[in-house]
Amino acid sequence: MARVKRSVNAKKKRREVLKSAKGYRGQRSRLYRKAKEQMLHSKTYEFRDRRAKKGDFRKLWITRINAAARQNDMTYNRLIQGLRLAGVDIDRKNLADLAVSDEQAFSALCAAAKDALPEDVNAPAK
């Protein structure tokens, strides 16, 4: 069999790794072995955090909705329950956006939710 010389491919591979490791601190941006290891960890964090971001944003939306709901004398869970009973189908992202940008519309939704809720807290839903 013919001898395989891979200097061109190996250099290209190393150059790509070092290029993608730019901005890392210390040896992690200059030494191939350290840079490669850091790239593997970076990809792991990248994958994990793309999924975690969805939950983080949901928590942020719920916090914003709860704060705005309390300004309208409601709690978050009563607001969501009232909106569901009133037949208002709006997701938390848009509800949080309304709470921040359009307080009058959010107050109208709170009023609709209050009307749909039963008077007695422990009473079953309509």
From Swiss-Prot:
UniProt function note: Binds directly to 23S ribosomal RNA and is necessary for the in vitro assembly process of the 50S ribosomal subunit. It is not involved in the protein synthesizing functions of that subunit.
Stated name of the protein: Large ribosomal subunit protein bL20
HAMAP family: Ribosomal_bL20
NCBIfam families linked: rplT_bact (TIGR01032)
Coiled-coil regions listed in the entry: none
Species lineage: Bacteria, Bacillati, Actinomycetota, Actinomycetes, Mycobacteriales
Family per similarity comment: Belongs to the bacterial ribosomal protein bL20 family.
Keywords: Ribonucleoprotein, Ribosomal protein, RNA-binding, rRNA-binding
Domain of life the protein comes from: Bacteria
GO BP term, pick one: ribosomal large subunit assembly
Keyword RNA-binding annotated: yes
A Pfam short name: Ribosomal_L20
Gene Ontology MF terms in the entry: rRNA binding; structural constituent of ribosome
SUPFAM superfamilies per the UniProt record, alphabetical: Ribosomal protein L20
